[in-house]
UniProtKB/Swiss-Prot annotation:
Statement: the UniProt record of this protein carries the keyword Amino-acid biosynthesis: no
Keyword list, A-Z: Lipid-binding
Protein name as annotated: DegV domain-containing protein lmo2514
Residues involved in hexadecanoate binding: S63, S96
InterPro entries to which the protein is assigned, alphabetical: DegV, DegV_C, DegV_domain_contain
Domain annotation DegV: ranges: 5-282
Superkingdom, taxonomy of origin: Bacteria
Family annotation (PANTHER family): DEGV DOMAIN-CONTAINING PROTEIN DR_1986-RELATED, FATTY ACID-BINDING PROTEIN TM_1468
Keyword DNA-binding attributed: no
Gene Ontology molecular function terms on file: lipid binding
Role: May bind long-chain fatty acids, such as palmitate, and may play a role in lipid transport or fatty acid metabolism.
Length: 283
C-alpha cells in the first residue's frame, strides 16, 4: 500500500489560494511586526495592507518565524488525518530558522515521517518545490521519487532580484550603511541572488533597465542549457511593473512558461516596495 504523503510549506511562497486548495498544500505562516503589533502573514495581513502600513509606521518592520509548537500542532493534525509522511518545504535556512523549527518539531511526532526540505530560496522559487511535491503526492508517487524531483528542480533553479531602494536591505542587516548611501547617491540598482542559502549582492547596475537586461541575459543562458522551462516574475507591490516585464519576457522567450507572483510582507521587509525578481527552473 502506498504511503499517504502531505505537503507543508510556509507563507513566504505566496502561492495563490486556489493552488493551495487544489493541491492540498498546508501553510504555516511567518509573522511581521509593525510598530510592536504582530500580524500572521497571509492570515491577518495581506501584501497590499502591509505596504500601506509600512508607509504609515514609525519603526522599520521586522519578521519572525513560526514557533515549533505551530508545526507540532499541524503535524499531529495531519497524522490524525491518516498521513504517514509529511514533506515540509521552507524558505532558506540561511535567512530564517523556519526550516530548523519544522525539522525539530518533526522529530517529536511519533508514527509520522517528517522530511524537512530546505528550498535554499524563498517566494515563488520556493513555491515551485511545494507545487511539484503536492502534484506528485496527489498522484501517489513515492517519497524517494518526489525528493529526487525536488533535487533536480533545485539543481536547475536560479533566482535574481532587483531592489528599488537599498535602505531596506541596510536596515534589515543585509547591506552596510556606506554602501546604501553610495547606492542612493549614484542611483545604483543592485542585483541580488541567493548564494549558499544567503541573499548576496550579485552585481551593481546603474539603471533598472540595465538590471532587467542583465537578468534576461542570464535567463537566456539557462534557456540554452534547458534549465529554464517555467519562470515567475515577482513584484513588490507594483503590479504594472511586474506585468510589463512579464509581457516583455513572454515575447522574448516563447519556450518558457511565465507566471506572475509577488513579494509579500515577510520578504517585503527586506526588499522593499518596487522590487522585481525572476526565478526559473525545469517543470
Amino acid at each position: 500500500m502506498n504511503e499517504k504523503i502531505a505537503v507543508v510549506t510556509d507563507s513566504t511562497t505566496y502561492l495563490p489560494d486556489e493552488v493551495k486548495e487544489q493541491l492540498r498544500i498546508n501553510v504555516v505562516p511567518l509573522s511581521v511586526i509593525i510598530d510592536g503589533k504582530s500580524y500572521r502573514e497571509g492570515e491577518e495581513l495581506s501584501a497590499t495592507d502591509f505596504y500601506r502600513k509600512v508607509k504609515e509606521a514609525e519603526n522599520f518592520p521586522t519578521s519572525s518565524q513560526p514557533a515549533p509548537g505551530e508545526f507540532i500542532h499541524l503535524f499531529e493534525n495531519l497524522k490524525e488525518q491518516g498521513f504517514d509522511t509529511v514533506i515540509s518545504i521552507h524558505l532558506s535556512s540561511g535567512i530564517s530558522g523556519t526550516f530548523q523549527n519544522a525539522a525539530s518539531a518533526g522529530e517529536l511526532i511519533e508514527g509520522l515521517n517528517v522530511v524537512a526540505y530546505d528550498s535554499e530560496l524563498s517566494c515563488m522559487a520556493q513555491g515551485m518545490f511545494a507545487v511539484k511535491a503536492a502534484e506528485m503526492a496527489l498522484a501517489n508517487e513515492p517519497l524517494d521519487q518526489i525528493i529526487q524531483k525536488l533535487d533536480k528542480i533545485k539543481q536547475a533553479q536560479d533566482a535574481y532580484f532587483m531592489v528599488d531602494d537599498l535602505n531596506n536591505l541596510q536596515r534589515g542587516g543585509r547591506l552596510n550603511g556606506a554602501q546604501a548611501l553610495v547606492g542612493s547617491l549614484l542611483q545604483i540598482k543592485p542585483i541580488l541572488h541567493f548564494n549558499d542559502k544567503q541573499i548576496v549582492l550579485f552585481e551593481k547596475v546603474r539603471t533598472q533597465k540595465k538590471a532587467l537586461k542583465r537578468i534576461e541575459d542570464i535567463l537566456q543562458k539557462a534557456v540554452q542549457n534547458k534549465t529554464a522551462e517555467k519562470a515567475y516574475v515577482i513584484h513588490g507591490n507594483d503590479l504594472a511593473k511586474g506585468e510589463a516585464w512579464l509581457a516583455q519576457l513572454e515575447a522574448k522567450f516563447p519556450e518558457v512558461t511565465f507566471e506572475l507572483s509577488y513579494f509579500g510582507p515577510v520578504i517585503g521587509t527586506h526588499l522593499g516596495e518596487g522590487a522585481l525578481g525572476l526565478t526559473w527552473s525545469i517543470k
